[in-house]
């Protein structure tokens, strides 16, 4: 098989678009990997700080920032991401998902340049804010794009590529940062931060060669392009394929339903009909932060300092959890579509609070005060004595096990889930608000955690353990199952108001809708529906084809 055939490369001219001169790739896995490079950038950001905060060259060059200042530098990226997430839907809904991904790449590159060239704390913060805005665009647009373009049976796998890219980005840049520790002077962090531009450049180029979201095109009455894209992804270009026609009919009927509520705004997310989805989406992203994982990522060097590890030993030990994060995410890409979202999230929550309480218990029992801090850092106020290796190893093992259960559950599951629960009309703004919530709590934790480590030390883990208990309970009672359902069926499941714990085997019966002439189009999700629409001479698909031909 040639590379062109494997990529499903098609030289299709799309009228009236900036991207019409470029051939497009229709291999859904390649599409997903390109769109989710924004996740790689997110991971690069996390590791770019965690690999540098313990180095003397970083501390000396940036005037030995205290815990509050360091929290501000770290949080500046999340602050920019929060802003970018809220702005993103205005571009994504008006100009397309691809435009948002291009803005993501452009802002990220600009921010990386400023960070690489930073002369002081202020310039570093400005660069991180701009890069953060890019990540805000990407974290809102990429999961939405992947959920809208993927066939239902593999939607979890494709959408999960975003989180997989995050884990790869963390691991890759951490090891780059570790290698740069052996370089003298400011070049150590400048090379590390400068290399952040690479995924931005790849995304900038790659977006030209992926198709637009068919659901976005349908919402903008561009049916010919919608048909071509769905056909090329699902059936190698066969527009008459039964599965292709069925997906197009689902999209068309959802567009009819959505057309009754144009100009959907953020305030509409809090109306009675939409509020349950909004609560679930916002709380899911909130819990992903409050479970403590990003604390493990941003501040892993501090954690291992508490366990008695210093210098290169600390960095090497810290890097293992980044490898585990990648390795444990890979099987989840395929298993989440087999076992479902709810079981994965609930089991993950149970094990996460187990290991958080384990870390807290070991540190509370075996650590001793460390006046003046550890290794010159007053943020770390306790340490396990060097002779107590069993306790130190217990902290390390619990940290690793936490990562092993977070990665395949709340790591990958939430970005998939929040891109599925909203309908076409709500999806851009609903996903953006959910992502903005993630970034808001990311910002708050980046500011809070250094001070928490300094003032309450091991009790910090008790707080995150309690949060993990709470998220497990809410997941059981409020998070419906979305596995194997079309996006349109998921929307109807909310309308039917089925208890979350009964949704795994529930098959929604979508309401009868009519075309503009009053003809019934049948029940969406009902096997008879396909025959109803095919036999209806005035169905929307035939009328849209006629309209295209007349034009």
Curated annotation (Swiss-Prot):
InterPro entries: MFS_dom, MFS_sugar_transport-like, MFS_Sugar_Transporters, MFS_trans_sf, Sugar/inositol_transpt, Sugar_transporter_CS. Residues 49-70, 120-123, 177-190, 311-315, 365-395, 454-459 are extracellular. It is found in: Membrane. Keywords: Glycoprotein, Membrane, Sugar transport, Transmembrane, Transmembrane helix, Transport. GO terms for molecular function: carbohydrate:proton symporter activity. It is a multi-pass membrane protein. The chain crosses the membrane at residues 28-48, 71-91, 99-119, 124-144, 156-176, 191-211, 290-310, 316-336, 344-364, 396-416, 433-453, 460-480. GO terms for cellular component: membrane. Residues 1-27, 92-98, 145-155, 212-289, 337-343, 417-432, 481-551 are cytoplasmic. It holds the Pfam family Sugar_tr. High-affinity glucose transporter. Belongs to the major facilitator superfamily. Sugar transporter (TC 2.A.1.1) family. This is High-affinity glucose transporter. It comes from Kluyveromyces lactis (strain ATCC 8585 / CBS 2359 / DSM 70799 / NBRC 1267 / NRRL Y-1140 / WM37). The gene is HGT1.
């Amino acid at each position: 098989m040639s590379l062109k055939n494997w990529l499903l490369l098609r030289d299709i001219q799309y009228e009236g678009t900036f991207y019409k001169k470029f051939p497009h790739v229709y291999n859904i896995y390649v599409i997903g990997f390109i769109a989710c490079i924004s996740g790689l950038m997110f991971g690069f950001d996390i590791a770019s700080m965690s690999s540098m905060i313990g180095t003397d060259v970083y501390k000396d060059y940036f005037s030995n920032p205290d815990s509050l200042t360091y929290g501000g530098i770290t949080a500046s990226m999340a602050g920019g991401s929060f802003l970018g997430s809220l702005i993103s839907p205005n571009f994504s809904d008006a100009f397309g998902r691809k435009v948002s991904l291009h803005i993501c790449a452009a802002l990220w590159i600009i921010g990386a340049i400023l960070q690489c060239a930073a002369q002081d704390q202020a310039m570093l913060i400005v660069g991180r804010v701009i890069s953060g805005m890019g990540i805000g665009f990407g974290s809102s647009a990429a999961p939405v794009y992947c959920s809208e373009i993927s066939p239902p049976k593999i939607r979890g796998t494709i959408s999960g590529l975003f989180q997989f890219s995050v884990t790869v980005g963390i691991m890759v840049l951490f090891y780059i940062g570790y290698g740069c520790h052996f370089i003298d002077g400011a070049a150590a962090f400048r090379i590390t931060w400068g290399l952040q531009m690479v995924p931005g450049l790849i995304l900038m180029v790659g977006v030209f060669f992926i198709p637009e979201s068919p659901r976005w095109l349908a919402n903008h009455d561009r049916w010919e392009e919608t048909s071509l894209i769905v056909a090329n992804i699902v059936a190698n270009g066969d527009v008459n394929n039964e599965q292709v026609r069925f997906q197009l009919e689902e999209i068309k009927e959802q567009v009819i339903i959505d057309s009754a509520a144009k100009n959907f705004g953020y305030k509409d997310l809090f109306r009675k009909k939409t509020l349950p989805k909004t609560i679930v989406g916002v709380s899911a992203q909130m819990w992903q932060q409050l479970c403590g994982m990003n604390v493990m990522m941003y501040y892993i060097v501090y954690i291992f300092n508490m366990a008695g590890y210093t210098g290169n030993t600390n960095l090497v030990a810290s890097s293992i959890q980044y490898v585990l994060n990648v390795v444990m995410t890979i099987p989840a890409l395929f298993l989440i579509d087999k076992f479902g979202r709810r079981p994965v999230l609930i089991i993950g929550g149970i094990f996460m609070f187990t290991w958080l309480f384990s870390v807290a218990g070991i540190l509370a029992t075996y650590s001793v005060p460390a006046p003046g801090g550890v290794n010159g850092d007053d943020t770390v106020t306790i340490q396990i004595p060097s002779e107590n290796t069993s306790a130190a190893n217990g902290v390390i093992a619990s940290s690793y096990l936490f990562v092993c259960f977070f990665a395949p559950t709340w790591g990958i599951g939430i970005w998939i889930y929040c891109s599925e629960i909203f309908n076409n009309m709500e999806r851009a703004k609903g996903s953006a608000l959910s992502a903005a919530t993630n970034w808001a709590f990311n910002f708050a934790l980046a500011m809070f955690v250094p001070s928490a480590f300094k003032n309450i030390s091991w009790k910090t883990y008790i707080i995150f353990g309690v949060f993990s208990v709470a998220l497990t309970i809410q997941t059981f009672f409020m998070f419906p199952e979305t596995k194997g359902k079309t996006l349109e069926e998921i929307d109807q499941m909310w309308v039917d108001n089925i208890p979350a714990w009964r949704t795994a085997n529930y098959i929604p019966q979508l309401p009868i809708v009519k075309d503009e002439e009053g003809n019934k189009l049948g029940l969406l999700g009902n096997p008879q529906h396909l025959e109803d629409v095919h036999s209806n001479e005035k169905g929307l698909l035939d009328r849209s084809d006629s309209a295209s031909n007349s034009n």
